[in-house]
């Protein structure tokens, strides 16, 4: 198949969907790969490195979309890309259709086949294409906290590392998933006092097995959260709040319980979600203060670690892309139920129930549109 890799156009997005080694894998299987000019520079990969592995460089995103059967990306599509879409084209990326109604309109209108990384499952009913970015986002979120608490950056002047004779900084991590484990592991390894909260006791038990000794694990309820945020120097949120809920885990009033000028890092960054006062920021302008508390709410933290993130993401997504390219998209979707869970739209039909309910659109199941009995 013909696979096109465009340059990401989101603000401060330095990742790219594929590494040169990934191109080599695709070309060895008879696929043709187009890379947009300088698409990999932000991740440390030159045009020449891609060409050496068999890719062809195109200098126009319009031409790349026109020539490609599969568009292989990192982030969602932006309005300036909508007109490039063509009927039957496969869009393989993080789509996040719930959050971007205009994108959903375009995908349906153009009758493309959208397959979202974030919804693909595995045999354990987990999300293998979220895991690599979640881990990097969690660890990256803590590394950003290290900078934000420095006095020169407007923080309280703390060092988030163990210093002999000095009280340890208190790091509270909400969520024991991949992001939370990443944040807690790094924070604990530097000698901070770390507390992890989750409503899932199985996740807490797993976290206890892998995290360093000394980390405290608490069931996430209102009292425990309030007790923890009173003492926290850094609060790191790593849970995605259910989209149908209108309440919040950390309300605006609860900020009054926190130490003045302490820090919230919202790795999940779902506006109006777990943290009421969260609103998305960018790497250009990452923090703001509300209620006397510093908020760091950048919604693409992994982009700051672009070379690592690109390599990790490509390692995770490439086997699925190879399956689609080898079998053809319909056969791949019919034979692989886990890949099928990622189907967002097909031939003008929305196939993701969650988006249908949220955006009040008609939808069908993937099995219905693929005529799977």
Per-region residue spans from a language model:
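Glycine-rich phosphate/diphosphate-binding loop of Rossmann-like nucleotide-binding domains
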Residues: 6-7, 11-42, 152-240
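Generic hydrophobic/aromatic pocket-lining and core-packing "Φ" positions
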Residues: 23, 47, 104, 142, ...
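N-terminal beta-loop-helix "entrance" segment that forms/cooperates
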Residues: 34-57
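An anion/phosphate-binding loop that grips the pyrophosphate of nucleotide cofactors and donors
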Residues: 67-68, 232
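Short glycine-/small-residue-rich Rossmann-like dinucleotide-binding loops
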Residues: 69, 75-76, 95-96, 221, ...
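Phosphate/diphosphate ligand-binding glycine-rich loop within oxidoreductases
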Residues: 70-149
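Adenosine-phosphate binding glycine-rich loop
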Residues: 118-144, 148-159, 168, 269, ...
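Rossmann-like adenosine-cofactor binding region
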Residues: 209-292
């Amino acid at each position: 198949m013909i696979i096109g890799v465009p340059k990401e156009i989101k603000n401060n997005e330095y990742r790219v969907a594929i590494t040169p080694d990934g191109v080599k894998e695709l070309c060895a299987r008879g696929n043709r790969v187009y890379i947009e000019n300088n698409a990999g520079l932000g991740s440390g990969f030159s045009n020449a490195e891609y060409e050496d592995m068999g890719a062809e460089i195109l200098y126009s995103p319009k031409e790349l979309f026109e020539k490609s059967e599969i568009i292989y990306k990192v982030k969602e599509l932006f309005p300036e890309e909508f007109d490039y879409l063509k009927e039957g084209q496969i869009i393989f990326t993080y789509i996040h259709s719930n959050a971007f109604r205009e994108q959903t309109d375009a995908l349906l209108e153009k009758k493309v086949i959208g397959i979202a990384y974030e919804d693909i499952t595995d045999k354990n009913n987990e999300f293998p294409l979220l895991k690599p970015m979640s881990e990097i986002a969690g660890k990256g979120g803590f590394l950003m906290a290290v900078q934000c608490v420095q006095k020169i950056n407007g923080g309280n002047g703390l060092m988030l590392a163990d210093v002999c004779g000095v009280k340890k900084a208190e790091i509270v991590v909400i969520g024991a998933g991949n992001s939370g484990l990443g944040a807690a592991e790094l924070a604990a390894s530097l000698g901070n006092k770390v507390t992890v909260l989750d409503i899932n006791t199985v996740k807490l038990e797993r976290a206890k097995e892998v995290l360093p000794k000394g980390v405290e694990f608490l069931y996430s309820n209102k009292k425990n959260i309030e007790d923890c945020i009173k003492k926290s120097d850094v609060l790191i949120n790593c849970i995605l709040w259910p989209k149908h809920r209108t309440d919040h885990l950390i309300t605006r009033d609860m900020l009054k319980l926190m130490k003045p000028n302490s820090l919230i890092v919202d790795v999940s960054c779902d506006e109006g979600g777990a943290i009421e006062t969260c609103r998305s920021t960018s790497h250009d302008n990452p923090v703001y203060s509300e209620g006397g508390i510093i908020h760091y709410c950048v919604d693409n933290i992994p982009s700051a670690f672009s070379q690592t993130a690109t390599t990790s993401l490509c390692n995770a997504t490439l086997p699925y892309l190879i399956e689609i390219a080898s079998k053809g998209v319909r056969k791949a979707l019919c034979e692989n139920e886990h890949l099928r869970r990622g189907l967002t739209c097909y031939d003008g039909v929305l196939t993701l129930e969650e988006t249908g309910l949220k955006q009040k659109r008609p939808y069908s199941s993937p099995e219905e549109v693929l005529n799977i009995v």
